[in-house]
Amino acid sequence: MPTINQLVRKGREKVEKKSKAPALQGNPQKRGVCVRVYTTTPKKPNSALRKVARVRLSNGYEVTCYIPGIGHNLQEHSIVLVRGGRVKDLPGVRYKIIRGALDAAGVKDRKQSRSKYGAKRPKPGQAAATTGKKK
């Protein structure tokens, strides 16, 4: 344990916290170009084909991004907006593509949590006809 005199002379060393999304360089989002769009399988207890894309960001970094929602229109050379946010069952995937921005279309026929998937508000008359629920 240091003496008061030692603390006055040197002070405490600050512990810098490590960024969870270093490729964004402190920005909320970054633009990038899809280099490869493919599916991959999740870690042990889960089973699925998760849609992911390898994206080259505008700052030169190349990252693996998750494509959220059901169905997508992304292919090689698509321009996408990338945000932070990991996918727990996909090792090495620490970023997500923002749906409804740039070349990534919003999820079709999405009724709930629309803002997260870039889906527009359904027309009032159409909504009642398409939902399968009774009142």
From Swiss-Prot:
Keyword vocabulary terms for this entry: Methylation, Ribonucleoprotein, Ribosomal protein, RNA-binding, rRNA-binding, tRNA-binding
Sequence segments annotated as region (Disordered): 1-29, 106-135
Any single GO BP term: translation
Signal peptide stretch: none
GO MF terms held by the record: rRNA binding; structural constituent of ribosome; tRNA binding
Gene3D superfamilies xrefs: Nucleic acid-binding proteins (2.40.50.140)
The keyword Signal is annotated on this UniProt entry: no
Modification 3-methylthioaspartic acid occurs at: 89
Annotated Basic residues bias: 113-123
Taxonomy, superkingdom: Bacteria
A GO cellular-component term linked to this record: small ribosomal subunit
Keyword Lipid biosynthesis in record: no
Family: Belongs to the universal ribosomal protein uS12 family.
Function recorded in the entry: With S4 and S5 plays an important role in translational accuracy. Interacts with and stabilizes bases of the 16S rRNA that are involved in tRNA selection in the A site and with the mRNA backbone. Located at the interface of the 30S and 50S subunits, it traverses the body of the 30S subunit contacting proteins on the other side and probably holding the rRNA structure together. The combined cluster of proteins S8, S12 and S17 appears to hold together the shoulder and platform of the 30S subunit.
Quaternary context: Part of the 30S ribosomal subunit. Contacts proteins S8 and S17. May interact with IF1 in the 30S initiation complex.
Name of the featured protein: Small ribosomal subunit protein uS12
Source species of the chain: Sulfurihydrogenibium sp. (strain YO3AOP1)
Taxonomic lineage from the root: Bacteria, Pseudomonadati, Aquificota, Aquificia, Aquificales
